[in-house]
Design a protein with these regions (language model features):
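Short, glycine/charged-enriched secondary-structure capping and boundary segments
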Residues: 11-13, 77-80, 119
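Alpha-helix N-cap/loop-to-helix initiation residues
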Residues: 4-5, 71
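Residues at alpha-helix caps and immediate loop-helix transition turns in enzyme cores, especially N-
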Residues: 7-11, 74, 142
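Short internal beta-strands
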Residues: 1-3, 90
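GT-A fold catalytic core of metal-dependent nucleotide-sugar glycosyltransferases
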Residues: 25-29, 46-114
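Catalytic core and acceptor-binding pocket of nucleotide-sugar-dependent glycosyltransferases
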Residues: 94-173
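Active-site-proximal specificity loops/subdomain of glycosyltransferases
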Residues: 5-56
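Short, intrinsically disordered, charge-balanced linker/junction segments flanking boundaries
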Residues: 16-24, 89, 167-173
């Protein structure tokens, strides 16, 4: 996060520890996410924080989950998924042409070796002007960027891992 006060983490951290987990407050470098990057009603600048996960987390595999997700079962098996040489795994979006960036299983080592953060930042800087000029229909912030950078390099996860109840019917009408 960029600006959540440390006090906010006390109670959730205690709850996580009671369940055998932990909650770690990682502060992003203010220079990572640019204030000029595209935001929308449903996309804050913090959405772009996903680009920098490998910079701050050292584990070989990382599971990113959007804050609005409801987890209904143990996620341990997710870390056993064979990534088959893909830097990320995600769920196909409701348009059946792209993936949704709300659930990302990241091969951290591969991401780092292939400088994916740099590719995402460069693509963001390059596409934002086009989006502002209206040259990219249905531009959806970081999700559009993720899909461009990883277009043929992602593994599809079971749709139950990011089921969008109701949204699947109305999203692209």
């Amino acid at each position: 996060n960029r600006d959540i006060l440390p006090d906010w983490f006390r109670k959730p951290r205690k709850m996580a520890q009671l369940l055998g987990g932990d909650l770690i407050d990682v502060k992003l470098n203010p220079d990572d996410v640019k204030d000029t990057w595209w935001t929308q009603e449903h996309i804050s600048l913090d959405a772009y924080s996903r680009y920098f996960i490998p910079k701050y987390i050292s584990e070989e595999k990382v599971l990113y989950l959007d804050a609005d997700l409801l987890v209904l079962k143990d996620l341990e098996d997710v870390f056993e998924i064979d990534m088959k040489g893909h830097p990320i795994a995600a769920v196909m979006d409701t348009d059946n042409q792209s993936f949704n960036s709300g659930v990302l299983l990241i091969d951290n080592g591969l991401w780092k070796r292939e400088n994916m953060t740099e590719q995402l930042v460069n693509e963001t800087n390059g596409l934002l002007q086009q989006a502002l000029e209206g040259n990219i229909p249905k531009f959806n912030g970081d999700q559009t960027i993720f899909n461009k950078v990883f277009r043929d390099r992602w593994l599809a996860l079971d749709k139950r891992m990011n089921l969008q109840v109701g949204h699947d019917v109305t999203a692209f009408m």
